[in-house]
Amino acid sequence: ALGFQSMAYAGLETGVTDRTSYVVVQDKIRLVFTTPMPGENNEIFDHIKKHGDGVKVIALWVDDAKKAWEETTSRGAESYFEPRTEEDKDGKMVKSGIKIYGDTVHIFIERKNYNGTFMPGFEKWESHYNPESIGLKYIDHMVANVGWNEMNIWEKFYNETMGFANLITFDDKDISTQYTALMSKVMTNGNGRIKFPINEPAEGKKKSQIEEYLDFYDGPGVQHIAVATDDIVRTVSLMKERGVEFLYVPGTYYDTVGDRVGEIAEDMAILKKHGILVDRDDEGYLLQIFTKPLTDRPTLFFEIIQRKGAQSFGKGNFKALFESIEAEQERRGTL
C-alpha cells in the first residue's frame, strides 16, 4: 500500500537465530520490521507484548559511532550498548546505542567502510511482489509522545546531550479544544535535516490523545513517522487506491484556510477532496495528511508531508490534527 520495495533479510537462512528481520526501501527511507524467534532473545518479545507493534529503534547515520556514543554518554545518556564492529565479506560497520524515552533507543550507524546490501547478517531480499513507488522520498520527522511534565526533560536531553536546538514550541493555548489539550516542542539538529517533535499531555476536561497513546502503548514512544513526498496529491491518491485510510478532516476546515495560508499553487478543491491540510510558516507553506493508526491499538500512524518552502510547522495543521484524533477518540469511547 505504501510502495516500498524489498531490500534485505536476516533470519535462519543468514545465520541469525533469535529474530527475523525484513528491510524495505523507498528512495532514502529504510524501514526494518523485526519479529522474535523462539529462544533467548526476550527483548523483542517483551517489547511487542508490552507495546504492541511500534518503533523500537531510531537509527542515526554518523561519521563516527564510537565518538557519538562516548560524547552522548559523557553528557548523561544511558548506554544501550557500547560501540561494536560487525563485519562480513562486504566490509565492516560500527554501531553503538543509547536509551531515550520509554523503551525507545537511538542506534548510531557508521557505514563508511561497508558496501553490502544493508548491514552484516543481512542478505539481499528478492521478492516477487514489488509494487510501484508512491513517491515517498525521506523521513521528514518522527514525533514522540512522553508523559506528564516530561517534555522539558527530553528537550533538555536533546539540547545538552545530542546538541539539538528548539525549532518551535506549541503550548496548550495553541493546541486545545473545549475538552483536551497538549504541548509540544520541536527539536532539530544543526543542519535541520533531523526533526524530533516531543508532545506531552496538558490539563483538560477529558483524556487527551497523548494520554490515550500512553495508556495503549503502555508508556512513552513514537506517535508517528512523517514521510516526505514531492507530489502529495499523487501520493495520497495512490495510497487511497491501495486501501489506506486517513483521518477525517471536517469540510469547514477549508472555509478559512485561504485567509490563513494565502495563495498556493495547488487546487484547494482537490486538497479538500483528499482531506489534505495546508499551513504556512515564515519561509513558505506545507501540505500534510495523516493515516489512521496502523494497528488495533490507537498508537503509531504515518504522516505524508510536502514542503513548499516551509521549514517548520504551522499551528493551524497541528490543531486540525489534534481535533481529528479527538473525534476518533470519541468514536472509540476513550475521550
Predicted regions and their residues:
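Short, well-structured beta-strand/strand-turn elements
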Residues: 5-10, 165-170, 246
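Amphipathic alpha-helical scaffolding segments
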Residues: 2-4, 75-79, 160-164
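C-terminal, well-structured subdomains that either form a transmembrane helix-short loop-helix hairpin
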Residues: 221-232
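Vicinal oxygen chelate
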Residues: 25-36, 57-146, 150-151, 156-157, ...
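Long hydrophobic segments that form regular secondary structure
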Residues: 142, 158-164, 219-221
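Exposed loop/turn and edge beta-strand positions of beta-sandwich/beta-sheet ligand-binding modules
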Residues: 18, 54, 92, 181, ...
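A generic N-terminal leader/anchor concept
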Residues: 1-57, 64
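Short, flexible turn/loop "capping" segments at secondary-structure junctions
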Residues: 50-51, 133-137, 215-219
